[in-house]
Amino acid sequence: TKAINYEMKDELITEKVGCIIAATGYDLMDWTVYEQYGGGKYPDVITSLQYERLLNASGPTGGHIVRPSDGKEPKKIAFIQCVGSRDPSRGRNLCSGFCCMYTAKQAVLTKDHIPDSQSYVFYMDIRAVGKGYDEFTRRAVEEYGTEYIRGRVSKIYPDGNGQYVVMGADTLLGTQVQVTVDMVVLAVGIEASHGAAALAEKLRISYDHYGFFMESHPKLRPVETNTAGVFLAGVCQGTKDIPNSVAQGSAAAAKVLSLFSRDKLQNDPQIAHVDIKRCVDCGKCIKCCPFGAIKEEAFRGQLKAKVIDTVCQGCGVCTSTCPQGAIQLSHATDNEILAEVNTLCQF
């Protein structure tokens, strides 16, 4: 159909929009830092995404599983999970969320492609929490003969005969394990997309210490952000698999459509307001506002702070920053809050 234009060049486009859906996805972490796995050094130690391309009919090998080093068909394959996930020693405590399932899928497909093959999966815990997920992992073991070994891999090295020795521990049996395989597949942990932090600064939205965008409320507003009109979809908000990403994308689209169906938008009445008599134009509120909702405006020959009502989200950062107490939140002024505290202290 010639739907893809291979000659297309980068183009800068400027548009005015009413809503933005951030769906920046994720990137794989730098797996070469795990030198004990031979990442980037041994040609037959590859990532799960690279192995996925080998399994794909449109991939470089037409769906045939071969070793990158010599093009031979592997008979024994070791899958190592949690490479860069749940690893406090490297400051990576989060679980990538979907590695357990795609590893089981790849082990099943390997058996379909190479019936006389044997797959070994080194894992920490099997986190199969979705619909039908646990049943699928059981099928991988019971019907396809995948051998699961609970424990970390300590080292991978070539044995000199074209194969690789995988050394680890079986924590269930309390013994050392040594497996000789033809190929090793690493389930590499994910991280926030490169450039996500810069985008968050432009959109004026928060992000956590892993770099994933923060939702407005984890239960009640999971696709919204603290900036009105900016929504989240997919892994940019946190680790999730394809069904959850599709569901969140649909929810974000529904939120946008609900805004388009209205003639007028309603803003939260609890916004900041400025007492121009007390304002000395120090500029601290302008610098601290995460939404850019405060500007300078001339009043009787003097510059004063001015709150843009339609932009203010009522977060209250400016009220706690102002040294003169010139900015207050509507229905939550200092006097009102202190009156509530004094009343509570009477009981």
Annotate each PLM feature.
Residues 1-347:
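Residues forming the flavin
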